[in-house]
């Protein structure tokens, strides 16, 4: 029994625990359900609150709108009542004046007719006889007599009207814009995807021109703009309820827009409000210069790169467009240099700033170099003056320093005793020089002494440079650097003097003996050197500690100045300096004047360049500084290579007649194919198979980035005098005009020799293959044509093959030309001209007067597509001698299957039905004179 009772207890406890376990999940699920219900209720409450806010805003906007409409209606009612009252008063006054007339029943129209007839005094009035006969003159312009009744003249008078002769109507004329050069079509002028409406003269109504009746036009999605009321609701709702997803969704449902659009619109509105509040009072104080100070040169020139055309050298080029691909040439032009580099550019020029310091340094060094003997005056006075004039005119360039150091090295090896003692003289302990008479060979001694002194000064300069570079790499090129060098050179030179005097070898002594006889009184010269050496050694121990402390002060001061000075150079100033080095070389005067005007002076530019050059070995340069150093080295290398070329023979180009006629083979192969559009390549080396020009079948031009030795580059001609109008000229044979930048003898100038070109000596000495480039066209007149419509006429007589003018127009694609040509064909006109494989010229809206030149099977002109500085252009030339006043005709040369009926040849007119449609649009072609 006890066991059964225990089992029952265990079972009941297990069932209780199981029921408890089942009740826990059910309670948690109920809690989750209650939380979701609470959250849903909160969201509903929030959405209801947002809706209430939106409704209140709508009601407020509606009330404001109603008030505004009522006010406008009241204002309009007042204005209309005043206007109608004035009109009513005028009508009433007219009625009163009419009622006062004698004949109240008279018709106003009849009265006006009588008044009008009474004013016709120029008409012939013929009286009528009693028998009814009249006197008439026989005239071709007379017509039947008309009898007028009324008060004009005698009763039953007959008036003979005048019949004007018939004048033919003027031909239809289209308004067009004159173009002196071709221009690319803008996107808004395209007719693709649009329906064209034209007037059909046969049926007398306007029709829609389309390629097919089922042509579907893609309708662009209408972009709904936000109204002012919607902006107000969005702004006020977000301010009242905050920016949340529920608010955005409610606004989107209410306005039937996307939630992202609502959010973007609010950000725009909020940004405009913040921007307007921040810019109040400070907009007009911002300078244009301050906008670019913190930018890099590339960022500042972003708009320049997009708007400036490097082929036409104009801004906003209509031919090549904006945002062209930048092509940087591999070969840079040599740096330009001024006429006289020794003339200072201004009061802040580095030449003026460095002359006093250099002169003072020279005096400090040369004061003790004078010998105490009788020959010292002749030895050292002349070199001192030469050094003040020539040696201390400022900092030398790197090449001059290297030359002086090499010279000093040779002198020091030959005469070491002449260098070290003299370089360590001090001006405070030097003995006074004595005056001695000069012997009969004094002139020779003067010259010899001068040369020796110059060598000594060059060796001293070498020692200064070596000691200064060993002491500090950051001191040279800035203020007080020269004084620090002199102090360190004096101390170190004394040490070298002691070592060299104690450890002199017999060979050195023998060299001394060989060199001292060149100077008069060698014993006195040696005694002076020994005395100066002892005095320098005595001074060295006393001033060593003082000089070392002063040196540390100078170094620390100069380092601080350099750091502050380098921070003052902004990014755009460093970029302009790099450009200046590329254009003008190391000429700091031209760089400061042309690129850094108002920012940095000539002295600042000079010091910065020296700092970059002297500290490049330490590896502390970065960014623009290393780039400046690269340009400095590159400029020196280019200058040196040009120097060696001038010393040698004249460098001849690797140019043969075979390479000059490289394009002739291509011409003959593609005789019947259209010209290829040229696009510059950006190759940085000799063009290979990947070159776009080579793959496109065109030659590389001067606008390409490849070097001049590229085999695919067109090299121009070497024609002499006026031989460029024959097929011996490579340019003329390739249907190109000569380019003054490429062709050797084809000059372009003012004719007076001011630009370095030969003086103009008549027509036989100038290139005659640059007519389109120089715009040397004939005068063309516009008049009524005897063939059709308007025509072009020549004002002056011309000879055969003379250039008349250019056929200009819009550059459009072939697809665009097919669409436009359908309208032109229906109007029986043609203004399309095939230019190359990409573009067609359309002169309907824009062009020159030669667009009116008509077609003729036997013309007196011909058209020719010519490449002029990389662009294809159409020139009109005389096929025969044309007299003044003759009309110009040329063969449009339509393709046989696309020519209209009036342009087909007589023998081919019946081969094809005139009413049969043809594929494509009729386009003019240039004459092929490549034969």
Curated annotation (Swiss-Prot):
Residues 528-549, 903-915 have a biased composition (Basic and acidic residues). Transmembrane segments: none annotated. Residues 664-763 form the CXC domain. Residues 565-615 form the SANT domain. It is found in: Nucleus. Its EC number is 2.1.1.356. It catalyses: L-lysyl(27)-[histone H3] + 3 S-adenosyl-L-methionine = N(6),N(6),N(6)-trimethyl-L-lysyl(27)-[histone H3] + 3 S-adenosyl-L-homocysteine + 3 H(+). Keywords: Methyltransferase, Nucleus, Repressor, S-adenosyl-L-methionine, Transcription, Transcription regulation, Transferase. Residues 386-398 have a biased composition (Basic residues). It comes from the Eukaryota. One of its GO terms (cellular component) is chromatin silencing complex. GO terms for biological process: heterochromatin formation; methylation; regulation of long-day photoperiodism, flowering. Residues 1-30, 500-509 have a biased composition (Low complexity). Residues 1-37, 372-450, 491-549, 903-931 are annotated as: Disordered. Widely expressed. Residues 375-385, 423-433 have a biased composition (Polar residues). One of its GO terms (molecular function) is chromatin binding. The keyword Disulfide bond does not apply. It is an enzyme of class 2 (transferase). SMART domains: CXC, SET. Residues 778-893 form the SET domain. PANTHER family: HISTONE-LYSINE N-METHYLTRANSFERASE E(Z) (PTHR45747:SF4). Polycomb group (PcG) protein. Catalytic subunit of some PcG multiprotein complex, which methylates 'Lys-27' of histone H3, leading to transcriptional repression of the affected target genes. PcG proteins are not required to initiate repression, but to maintain it during later stages of development. Belongs to the class V-like SAM-binding methyltransferase superfamily. Histone-lysine methyltransferase family. EZ subfamily. This is Histone-lysine N-methyltransferase EZ1. It comes from Zea mays.
């Amino acid at each position: 029994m006890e066991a059964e009772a225990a089992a029952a207890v265990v079972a009941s406890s297990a069932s209780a625990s199981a029921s408890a376990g089942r009740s826990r999940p059910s309670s948690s699920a109920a809690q989750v359900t209650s939380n979701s219900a609470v959250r849903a209720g909160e969201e509903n409450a929030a959405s209801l609150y947002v809706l209430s806010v939106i409704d209140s805003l709508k009601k407020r906007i509606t009330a404001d709108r109603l008030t505004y409409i009522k006010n406008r209606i009241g204002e309009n009612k007042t204005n209309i009542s005043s206007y109608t009252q004035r009109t009513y008063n005028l009508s009433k006054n007219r009625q009163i004046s009419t009622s006062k007339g004698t004949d109240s029943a008279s018709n106003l129209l009849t009265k006006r007719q009588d008044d009008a007839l009474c004013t016709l005094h120029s008409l012939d009035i013929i009286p009528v006889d009693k028998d009814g006969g009249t006197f008439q003159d026989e005239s071709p312009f007379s017509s039947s007599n008309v009898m007028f009744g009324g008060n004009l003249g005698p009763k039953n008078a007959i008036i003979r009207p005048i019949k004007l002769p018939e004048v033919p109507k003027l031909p239809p004329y289209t308004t067009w814009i004159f173009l002196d050069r071709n221009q690319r079509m803008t996107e808004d002028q395209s007719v693709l995807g649009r329906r064209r409406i034209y007037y059909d003269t046969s049926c007398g109504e306007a029709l829609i021109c389309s390629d097919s009746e089922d042509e579907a036009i893609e309708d662009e999605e209408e972009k709904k703009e936000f109204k002012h009321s919607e902006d107000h609701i969005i702004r006020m709702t977000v301010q009242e309820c905050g920016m949340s997803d529920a608010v955005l969704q409610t606004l989107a449902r209410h306005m039937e827009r996307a939630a992202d659009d609502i959010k973007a619109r609010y950000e725009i509105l909020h940004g405009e409000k913040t921007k307007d509040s921040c810019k109040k009072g400070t907009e007009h104080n911002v300078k244009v210069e301050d906008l670019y100070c913190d930018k890099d040169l590339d960022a500042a020139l972003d708009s320049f790169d997009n708007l400036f055309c490097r082929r036409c050298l104009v801004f906003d080029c209509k031919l090549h467009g904006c945002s062209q691909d930048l092509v940087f040439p591999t070969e840079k032009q040599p740096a330009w240099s001024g006429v006289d580099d020794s003339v200072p550019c201004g009061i802040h020029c580095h030449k003026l700033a460095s002359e006093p310091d250099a002169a003072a340094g020279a005096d400090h060094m040369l004061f003790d170099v004078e010998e105490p003997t009788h020959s010292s005056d002749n030895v050292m006075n002349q070199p001192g003056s030469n050094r003040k004039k020539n040696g201390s005119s400022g900092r030398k360039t790197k090449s001059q320093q290297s030359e002086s150091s090499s010279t000093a090295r040779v002198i020091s090896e030959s005469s070491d005793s002449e260098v070290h003692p003299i370089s360590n003289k001090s001006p405070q302990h030097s003995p006074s020089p004595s005056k001695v008479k000069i012997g009969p060979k004094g002139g020779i001694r003067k010259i010899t002494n001068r040369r020796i002194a110059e060598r000594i000064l060059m060796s001293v300069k070498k020692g200064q440079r070596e000691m200064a570079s060993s002491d500090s790499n950051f001191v040279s090129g800035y203020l007080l650097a020269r004084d620090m060098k002199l102090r360190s050179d004096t101390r170190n030179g004394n040490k070298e003097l002691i070592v060299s005097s104690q450890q002199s070898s017999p060979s050195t002594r023998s060299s001394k003996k060989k060199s001292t006889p060149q100077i008069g009184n060698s014993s006195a010269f040696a005694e002076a050197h020994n005395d100066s050496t002892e005095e320098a050694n005595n001074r060295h121990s006393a001033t060593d500690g003082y000089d070392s402390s002063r040196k540390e002060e100078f170094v620390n001061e100069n380092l601080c100045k350099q750091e502050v000075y380098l921070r003052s150079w902004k990014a755009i100033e460093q970029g302009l300096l790099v450009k200046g080095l590329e254009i003008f070389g190391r000429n700091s005067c031209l760089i400061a004047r042309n690129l850094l005007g108002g920012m940095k002076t000539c002295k600042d530019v000079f010091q910065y360049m020296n700092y970059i050059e002297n500290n490049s070995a330490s590896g502390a340069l970065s960014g623009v500084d290393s780039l400046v150093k690269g340009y400095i080295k590159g400029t020196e290398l280019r200058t040196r290579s040009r120097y060696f070329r001038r010393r040698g023979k004249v460098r001849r180009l690797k140019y043969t007649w075979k390479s000059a006629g490289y394009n002739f083979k291509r011409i003959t192969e593609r005789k019947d194919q259209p010209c290829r559009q040229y696009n510059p390549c950006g190759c940085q080396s000799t063009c290979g198979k990947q070159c776009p020009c080579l793959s496109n079948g065109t030659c590389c031009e001067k606008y390409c980035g490849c070097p001049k030795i590229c085999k695919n580059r067109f090299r121009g001609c070497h024609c002499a005098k006026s031989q460029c109008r024959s097929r011996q000229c490579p340019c003329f044979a390739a249907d190109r005009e000569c380019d003054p930048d490429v062709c050797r003898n084809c000059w372009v100038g003012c004719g007076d020799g001011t630009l370095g070109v030969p003086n103009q000596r008549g027509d036989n000495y100038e290139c005659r293959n640059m007519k389109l480039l120089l715009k040397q066209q004939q005068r063309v007149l516009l008049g009524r044509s005897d063939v059709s419509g308007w025509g072009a006429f020549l004002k002056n007589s011309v000879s055969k093959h003379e250039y008349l003018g250019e056929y200009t127009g819009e550059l459009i694609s072939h697809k665009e030309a097919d669409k436009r040509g359908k309208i032109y064909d229906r109007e029986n006109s043609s203004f399309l001209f095939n230019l190359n494989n990409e573009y067609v010229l359309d002169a309907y809206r824009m062009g020159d007067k030669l667009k009116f030149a008509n077609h003729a099977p036997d013309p007196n002109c011909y058209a020719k597509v010519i490449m002029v500085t990389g662009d294809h252009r159409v020139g009109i030339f005389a096929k025969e001698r044309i007299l003044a006043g003759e009309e110009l005709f040329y063969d449009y040369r339509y393709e046989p299957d696309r020519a209209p009926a009036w342009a087909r040849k007589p023998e081919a007119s019946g081969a094809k039905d005139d009413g049969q449609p043809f594929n494509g649009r009729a386009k003019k072609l240039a004459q092929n004179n490549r034969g």
